Curated annotation (Swiss-Prot):
Textual note on the cofactor: Binds 1 heme group per subunit.
Record gene name: tdo2b
Enzyme Commission designation: 1.13.11.11
BP GO annotations: L-tryptophan catabolic process to acetyl-CoA; L-tryptophan catabolic process to kynurenine; protein homotetramerization
Keyword list, A-Z: Dioxygenase, Heme, Iron, Metal-binding, Oxidoreductase, Tryptophan catabolism
Protein name: Tryptophan 2,3-dioxygenase B
InterPro entries (UniProt xref): Trp/Indoleamine_2_3_dOase-like, Trp_2_3_dOase
Pfam family for this entry, one: Trp_dioxygenase
Its job: Heme-dependent dioxygenase that catalyzes the oxidative cleavage of the L-tryptophan (L-Trp) pyrrole ring and converts L-tryptophan to N-formyl-L-kynurenine. Catalyzes the oxidative cleavage of the indole moiety.
Family, per entry: Belongs to the tryptophan 2,3-dioxygenase family.
Record text on subunit structure and interactions: Homotetramer. Dimer of dimers.
Binding site for substrate: 71-75, 143, 341
């Protein structure tokens, strides 16, 4: 018999007794609580405001352009996600500022919130693909209605850069002016106020400086590492010098000399200060030591969560660079080499911001330069081997073993 294959016993809901069939259907066993009053979905999310915030300038001017709606919604979505990133970032900074990270059990909270920021940034990087469904000609149709509005005027993105720790003196000037000059009134005051607060970079730096095991009168990681590396390089050079004179021997000696120069510079505090003044390093000398120690001992229980944090911070830098790059590519595709709607050089200005000048945790990336064979890494003493909340008691950089209340 031909007909619908679903007209079998499973459709007994359409039987002569619909009430009985409904009672037997488990999917209908809930209760409609909305009928009893209280806040409902649209009110909770204030959708009347959100969904009515798309005002097309082309329509206001009597020439409604379809793709302007996509342009507005996409940028509003960016701003909402920026707001969430700032929410997470401020909470992490607060945990550091109030010294809750001295109780290392709170570090998992820090890592998970930083990880959430990276997940949001991944979404923001991918979101450009939606905007790129619009062609350059589609954008041209309504671009004239945008001026002098510009993405550079995004207060939240400037706050995000500032709070993470983008160095003010390394920023590329915007039309030969300080970036803050593009903001006025309350927005300018908000930026000024934010600049007085410690950045995530500064807070992480202070935390790294307290890494257990850096104390010269304790484990003295740095001193032991320097001695081990110098001895290791000396042994390697001795082995190479015993080889027959060949091109391979010469190459190995040149490589060893470069390594020696690299590590001589690493253990030279004055050299580090010089690189700091040039903006080539961002962390203090002691903080760099802490970061390298965490990398070497990342498999130890004490250092596993700190290593996850350093990895997540590098991921933020990576994703922000990808975001800038995708933005540059999109702008180049949409307007070519034209000036931006806000008056900047457009593509050329944006391209100049895709560099290490805007990387906050560049020192963490450069740690790979200083990796050595595991046999050269100093062996940990039993105290540092202990789990986080017990090891804190043996760490002279902490004043006590008491935990503090956390948010």
């Amino acid at each position: 018999m031909s007909g619908c294959p679903f007209l079998g016993g499973t459709l007994q809901l359409l039987s002569s007794n619909p009430r009985q069939a409904e009672e037997e259907d488990g999917s209908q066993g809930g209760v409609n609580k909305a009928a009893k009053g209280g806040i409902i979905y649209g009110d909770y999310l204030q959708l009347d405001k959100v969904l009515n915030a798309q005002v097309l300038q082309s329509e206001q001017k009597g020439n409604k352009i379809h793709d302007e709606h996509l342009f507005i919604v996409t940028h509003q979505a960016y701003e909402l996600w920026f707001k969430q990133i700032l929410w997470e970032l401020d909470s992490v900074r607060d945990l550091f500022i109030k010294k809750h990270v001295r109780d290392e059990r709170n570090m998992l909270k820090v890592v998970s919130r930083i990880h959430r920021i990276t997940m949001i940034f991944k979404l923001l990087v991918d979101q450009f693909a939606v905007l790129e469904t619009m062609t350059a000609l589609d954008f041209f149709d309504f671009r004239e209605y945008l001026s002098p509005a510009s993405g550079f005027q995004s207060l939240q993105f400037r706050l995000l850069e500032q709070k993470i720790g983008v160095a003010d003196h390394l920023r590329v000037p915007y039309n030969r002016r300080h970036y803050r000059d593009n903001f006025h009134g309350e927005e300018s005051e908000t930026l000024l106020s934010s600049e007085q607060e410690p950045t995530l970079l500064q807070l992480v730096e202070q935390w790294l400086e307290r890494t257990p095991g850096l104390e010269k009168d304790g484990f003295n990681f740095w001193g032991k590492l320097q001695a081990n590396i110098e001895e290791g390089l000396k042994r390697e050079k001795h082995q190479v010098e015993k080889m027959e004179d060949t091109e391979v021997k010469q190459e190995l000696l040149e490589d060893l000399n470069k390594q020696m120069e690299t590590f001589t510079a690493l253990f030279d505090s004055k050299r580090h200060e010089h690189l700091l003044s040039k903006g080539e390093r961002r962390l203090s000398y002691k903080a760099l030591q802490g970061a390298l120690m965490i990398n070497f001992y990342r498999e130890e229980p004490r250092f596993q969560v700190p290593f996850q944090l350093l990895t997540a911070l590098m991921e933020i830098d990576t994703l922000m660079t990808k975001w800038r790059y995708n933005h540059v590519c999109m702008v180049h595709r949409m307007i070519g080499s034209k000036a931006g709607t806000g008056g900047s050089s457009g593509y050329h200005y944006l391209r100049s911001t895709v560099s290490d000048r805007y990387k906050v945790f560049v020192d963490l990336f450069n740690l790979a330069t200083f990796l050595v064979p595991r046999s050269w890494v100093p062996k940990l003493n039993p105290n540092i081997h202990k789990f986080p909340y017990t090891a804190e008691c043996y760490d002279s950089s902490y004043n006590s073993c008491s935990s503090e209340d956390s948010d």
